[in-house]
Amino acid sequence: MIPVLEAVPNFSEGRDRTIVDAIVDAISVHDVEVLDVSMDPDHHRSVVTFIGHPAAVEGALVDAAEVALERIDLRSHAGVHPRVGALDVCPVVPVHGLEMSDAVQSARRIGEGIAELGIPVFWYGEAADEPGSGLAPLRKGGFESFVGGWPSGRIPDLAAGRTAAHPTAGITCVGARPVLLAWNAWVEGLDREALAEIARLIRERDGGIPGLRALALEVPRQGGLQLSMNLEGVQARDPFDVFLRVEGHVEAAGGHISRTEVIGMIPDTLVFPAATHRLRLSEPDPSRMLSARVQRHALDRTERDLRTVVEWVLGAGSEVPVDIRDAARLLAGRATTKPSPGEDA
């Protein structure tokens, strides 16, 4: 099975398209596919989603970190979203033919490459020494809290030879994690204080919805107030049920959700439960989703055809040039990689 790793790096630039384009260009020269680029001027942040073979993804992320180092200066950066680095957060996700342990090894190699640029690195998520460690404690106080030295209890895993954050690029949090749902909800009819109370009520950290992280933010450039949310453990949760619970808190306080947006990509497996609720399907069956079945069919055909070619090349022996035989052996090795549990795309 062909291994596919997803990367969802967050960069502290959401207003200058030329800088974001330069970052995306640095990623695109590698053998990866860029799936989405989301820029937000209020957050002053961009999220790039791309997939590829782990080695290509690793190289693309280190090159993107170098462009961010050259083009982003946190000393003049101000946005409503917390940040500690030019390349702020760098998660990788095993989406096909990989175990989480493979993603952790990729994250470690990426972090080492970023540290070689002179940027200190913290591990988080499954890549942390204590797997599952979150981002919130690392980002407390933002970039400014690291400028004068390492805060108590927050020493980077890779200090890059420094005793404080890089003066312009800060630090980078590198992690491995399962798929999550990142989405924002625009709220009308409430003030900032009321929305902050709702964020406190719904997030897991304060005893709310399991797996949910939430921030109440003012977004003046786009107008209004926003709940910025991440839902973790989505394979075991119904995002639509989470939305209804969040909406219930907002309406109970006298407001309403005017619209929402997804940041990055959303798997079919997360859309289906919402459709089931809204359409009141009597026999919900995810296997009947056409897009998922077509994807599976195309992938099976591709792997079958590739296996046929590889077997022919390896069986032909000396009749085939040595470099082609070497490539076939490499592909044969990749094809034996075990699939990851809970695969999503």
What would you call each of these model-derived segments?
Residues 1-341:
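Long, contiguous binding/interaction regions
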